[in-house]
């Protein structure tokens, strides 16, 4: 009977220990890798850090980048920000929103752009607002231009015998619809739009790169062409040739960080502690399965 009670007690203690260790591990992962829910802000904010914000893919919205910029702007432990750019461009308005936000942040802390494979068009628009631009010799950048591509399918429609009835209020409401060819007035309107946006692009790059490239020189190459990183450096479109870690060093120097800086990426937002626990548990299971799979793959095959 005593042995039975001892076994039950021992099992209970072991279960408690497992629960406690799991809790501590989850909590440590929580503070290390994920964003803290409300109530924990300010805890463990230490050291001189550099915030890394990825800008990837086609730029169609500014929301995520703006949110990350604001977070890093407010964190006192973040001394500088690096935008890790790998984007061929996108739409102009989101680029302008990000450009304006970087202008504000630069009054408080330095912002550096690190171009990986490509940082062209709207992505270069964003980069031009930073304190420094770092890229590799073979990176693709520049492409200061505006393009509108409007398919004209009216001949196809006529060929297959489809009639398109247009009801509109406003003479140019169906401009660029593709179901009819552009007339001269419509083409002039669209050209005027593209030219205006192009001038906005050029003007902002001139402002962002002030003192680094002459306006006349910039205008002469702001014709939509793209450049290698090395050519862009020679022209004054970027500041230095280097990789991601070189950009971090530049940011650290500008931010007054001595020694090896600690880097921080945007954290994933958790709606509840349960979400955090479930995510941590699922990651542990996946890692366990990966380990088991590796062990099996390395095992000798019977012959």
List the predicted regions and their residue ranges:
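N-terminal organellar transit peptides
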Residues: 1-113, 117-119, 130-136, 149-303
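Short gly/pro/ser/thr-enriched loop/turn and capping motifs at secondary-structure boundaries
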Residues: 118-122, 140-144
């Amino acid at each position: 009977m005593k042995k039975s009670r001892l076994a039950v007690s021992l099992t209970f203690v072991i279960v408690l220990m497992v629960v406690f260790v799991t809790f501590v591990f989850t909590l440590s992962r929580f503070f290390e890798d994920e964003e803290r829910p409300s109530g924990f802000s300010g805890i463990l904010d230490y050291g001189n850090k550099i915030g890394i914000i990825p800008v990837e893919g086609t730029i169609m919205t500014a929301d995520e980048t703006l949110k990350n910029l604001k977070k890093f702007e407010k964190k006192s432990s973040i001394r500088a920000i690096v935008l890790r750019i790998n984007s061929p461009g996108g739409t102009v308005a989101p680029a302008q929103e990000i450009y304006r936000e970087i202008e504000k942040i630069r009054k408080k802390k330095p912002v550096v752009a690190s171009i990986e494979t490509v940082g062209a068009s709207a992505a270069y628009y964003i980069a031009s607002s930073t304190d420094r631009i770092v890229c590799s010799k073979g990176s693709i950048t520049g492409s200061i231009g505006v393009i509108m591509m409007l398919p004209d399918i009216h001949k196809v429609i006529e060929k297959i015998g489809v009639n398109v009835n247009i009801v509109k209020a406003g003479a140019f409401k169906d401009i660029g619809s593709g179901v009819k060819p552009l007339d001269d007035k419509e083409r002039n309107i669209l050209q005027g739009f593209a030219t205006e946006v192009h001038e906005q692009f050029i003007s902002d790059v001139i402002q962002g790169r002030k003192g680094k490239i002459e306006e006349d020189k910039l205008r002469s190459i702001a014709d939509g062409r793209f450049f290698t990183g090395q050519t862009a450096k020679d022209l004054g479109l970027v500041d230095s040739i280097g990789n991601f870690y070189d950009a971090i060093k530049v940011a650290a120097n500008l931010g007054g960080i001595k020694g090896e800086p600690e880097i921080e990426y945007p954290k994933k937002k958790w709606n509840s502690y349960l979400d955090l626990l479930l995510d941590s548990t699922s990651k542990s299971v996946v890692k366990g399965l990966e380990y088991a799979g590796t062990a099996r793959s390395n095992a000798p095959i019977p012959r």
